[in-house]
């Protein structure tokens, strides 16, 4: 489930910081990414991850970082949040981590072959983050953005998205952005030429894991705890009706965008 942050600056900031108190929940229950994503990333960048100097920005608890490293990349992580950074260090103590964000990268010019933003570019200001990416990338380097999203051609996921929208008043991303160009949203300046791909995958998890994953999204983290808990309790009933065995098949579309500098 990808829930787009509110455009209100104060609410946006509150949501961006909400993950720090839920870092352990985030690390334990958020979905990973499939091998096909990294195969596609290598195809679009025209270079292997093995041996590449990669900066993973907004690294969070290190879900994407660990997979990049497993592909042989030499990774540096950048993370602004205290709680997320602490969880990252517990999970990946041997991976260099610097504190900062994509709007002002604490890195030297032309130091990276690849900048990655796994589930994090939407927390940046593109007017600042795009020039920073171009500054840090080496000639021929690439910027890669990706998000796990919930495709609404899966009936139970569409029904759940509708319930979330009704209960919390959250605009569904597909409703808001269906006619918008993804590249223009990611880079309103038009300086980057993105190639977009979608990689579908799925995982099977217990109902409790799915609910904990859902509850780790900022829209829930900033809600009154009793309100969020009531929604998740009701959601459990819906899920058990759809999956009486107690195991949920979560289907994801990873939306990947790659721009070569």
Outline where the language-model segments fall.
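Conserved class I S-adenosyl-L-methionine
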Residues: 1-50, 84
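A structural alpha-helix within SAM-dependent methyltransferase catalytic domains
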Residues: 42, 66-69, 130, 134
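Class I SAM-dependent methyltransferase SAM/SAH-binding core
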Residues: 55, 61-104
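A short acidic, Gly/Pro-enriched loop at the edge of an enzyme's catalytic core
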Residues: 103-114
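A short SAM/SAH-binding and catalytic strip from SAM-dependent methyltransferases
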Residues: 113-127
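Conserved catalytic/acceptor-binding region of the Class I
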Residues: 128-203
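Conserved Class I S-adenosyl-L-methionine
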Residues: 181-261
């Amino acid at each position: 489930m990808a829930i787009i942050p509110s455009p209100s600056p104060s609410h946006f900031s509150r949501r961006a910081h909400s993950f720090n108190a839920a870092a352990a929940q985030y690390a334990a229950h958020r979905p990973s990414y499939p091998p096909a994503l990294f195969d596609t990333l290598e195809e679009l960048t025209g270079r292997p991850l093995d041996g590449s100097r990669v900066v993973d920005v907004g690294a969070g608890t290190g879900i994407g970082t660990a997979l990049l490293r497993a592909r042989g990349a030499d990774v540096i992580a950048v993370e602004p949040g205290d709680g997320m950074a602490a969880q990252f260090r517990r999970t990946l103590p041997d991976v260099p981590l610097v504190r900062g964000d994509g709007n002002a990268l604490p890195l030297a010019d032309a130091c990276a072959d690849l900048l990655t933003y796994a589930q994090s570019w939407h927390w940046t200001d593109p007017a600042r983050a795009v020039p920073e990416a171009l500054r840090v990338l080496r000639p021929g380097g690439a910027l890669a953005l990706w998000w796990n999203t919930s495709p609404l051609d899966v009936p139970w996921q569409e029904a759940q998205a509708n319930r979330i929208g009704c209960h919390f008043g959250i605009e569904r991303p597909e409703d808001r952005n269906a006619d918008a160009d993804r590249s223009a949203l990611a880079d309103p300046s038009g300086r980057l030429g993105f190639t977009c791909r979608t990689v579908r995958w799925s995982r099977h998890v217990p109902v409790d894991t799915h609910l904990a994953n859902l509850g780790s999204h900022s829209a829930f983290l900033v809600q009154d705890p009793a309100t969020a808990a009531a929604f998740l309790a009701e959601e459990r009933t819906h899920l058990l009706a759809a999956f009486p065995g107690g195991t949920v098949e979560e289907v994801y579309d990873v939306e990947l965008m790659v721009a070569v500098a």
